[in-house]
Amino acid sequence: MMTKHKKCFIIVGVLITTNIITLIVKLTRDSQSLCPYDWIGFQNKCYYFSKEEGDWNSSKYNCSTQHADLTIIDNIEEMNFLRRYKCSSDHWIGLKMAKNRTGQWVDGATFTKSFGMRGSEGCAYLSDDGAATARCYTERKWICRKRIH
């Protein structure tokens, strides 16, 4: 036979569990709803994976028309997320490389070489094998990124 206290603890436990589940669902939905249609939310940022192709400069311009930049890759989790969602196509990212193998992101930050970069051309893209460079006039899809405010 269950005492009043046991019933009370069970009811409180069920209510707390229900509230936690509701909060998790709401936070997940809110984070995604802060991103525009066709954009994907991850780590307080929204990402757009283009369906069309363009050279690096036109890709950068297309992102700017959406109040975004070609994506910057801040950490390995972000790199893994981008590689997972880009499917099999190569996508331009917001990194330009100089002849001396130094790189600069579109926000002005220096490329810290936190991940490998194949190739010796001027503009960076993401492939199935990671990051690489190509001639900037090559047509590729692109990835835009903007922060959630």
Swiss-Prot record:
<feature type="topological domain" description="Cytoplasmic">
    <location>
        <begin position="1"/>
        <end position="7"/>
    </location>
</feature>
<keyword id="KW-1003">Cell membrane</keyword>
<feature type="domain" description="C-type lectin">
    <location>
        <begin position="42"/>
        <end position="145"/>
    </location>
</feature>
<keyword id="KW-0832">Ubl conjugation</keyword>
<protein>
    <recommendedName>
        <fullName>C-type lectin domain family 2 member B</fullName>
    </recommendedName>
</protein>
<keyword id="KW-0735">Signal-anchor</keyword>
<dbReference type="GO" id="GO:0042802">
    <property type="term" value="F:identical protein binding"/>
</dbReference>
<keyword id="KW-0333">Golgi apparatus</keyword>
<keyword id="KW-1133">Transmembrane helix</keyword>
<feature type="disulfide bond">
    <location>
        <begin position="63"/>
        <end position="144"/>
    </location>
</feature>
<keyword id="KW-0812">Transmembrane</keyword>
<dbReference type="InterPro" id="IPR016186">
    <property type="entry name" value="C-type_lectin-like/link_sf"/>
</dbReference>
<feature type="transmembrane region" description="Helical; Signal-anchor for type II membrane protein">
    <location>
        <begin position="8"/>
        <end position="25"/>
    </location>
</feature>
<keyword id="KW-0430">Lectin</keyword>
<comment type="function">
    <text>Membrane-bound protein expressed on myeloid cells which acts as a ligand to stimulate the activating receptor NKp80/KLRF1, expressed on the surface of natural killer (NK) cells. In turn, stimulates NK-cell cytotoxicity and cytokine production leading to the cytolysis of malignant CLEC2B-expressing myeloid cells.</text>
</comment>
<dbReference type="GO" id="GO:0048018">
    <property type="term" value="F:receptor ligand activity"/>
</dbReference>
<feature type="glycosylation site" description="N-linked (GlcNAc...) asparagine">
    <location>
        <position position="62"/>
    </location>
</feature>
<dbReference type="GO" id="GO:0030246">
    <property type="term" value="F:carbohydrate binding"/>
</dbReference>
<feature type="disulfide bond">
    <location>
        <begin position="35"/>
        <end position="46"/>
    </location>
</feature>
<dbReference type="GO" id="GO:0051132">
    <property type="term" value="P:NK T cell activation"/>
</dbReference>
<dbReference type="InterPro" id="IPR050828">
    <property type="entry name" value="C-type_lectin/matrix_domain"/>
</dbReference>
<dbReference type="Pfam" id="PF00059">
    <property type="entry name" value="Lectin_C"/>
</dbReference>
<keyword id="KW-1015">Disulfide bond</keyword>
<feature type="topological domain" description="Extracellular">
    <location>
        <begin position="26"/>
        <end position="149"/>
    </location>
</feature>
<feature type="disulfide bond">
    <location>
        <begin position="123"/>
        <end position="136"/>
    </location>
</feature>
<dbReference type="GO" id="GO:0005886">
    <property type="term" value="C:plasma membrane"/>
</dbReference>
<feature type="glycosylation site" description="N-linked (GlcNAc...) asparagine">
    <location>
        <position position="100"/>
    </location>
</feature>
<keyword id="KW-0472">Membrane</keyword>
<dbReference type="GO" id="GO:0000139">
    <property type="term" value="C:Golgi membrane"/>
</dbReference>
<dbReference type="InterPro" id="IPR001304">
    <property type="entry name" value="C-type_lectin-like"/>
</dbReference>
<keyword id="KW-0325">Glycoprotein</keyword>
<feature type="glycosylation site" description="N-linked (GlcNAc...) asparagine">
    <location>
        <position position="57"/>
    </location>
</feature>
<comment type="subunit">
    <text>Homodimer. Interacts with NKp80/KLRF1.</text>
</comment>
<dbReference type="InterPro" id="IPR016187">
    <property type="entry name" value="CTDL_fold"/>
</dbReference>
<dbReference type="InterPro" id="IPR033992">
    <property type="entry name" value="NKR-like_CTLD"/>
</dbReference>
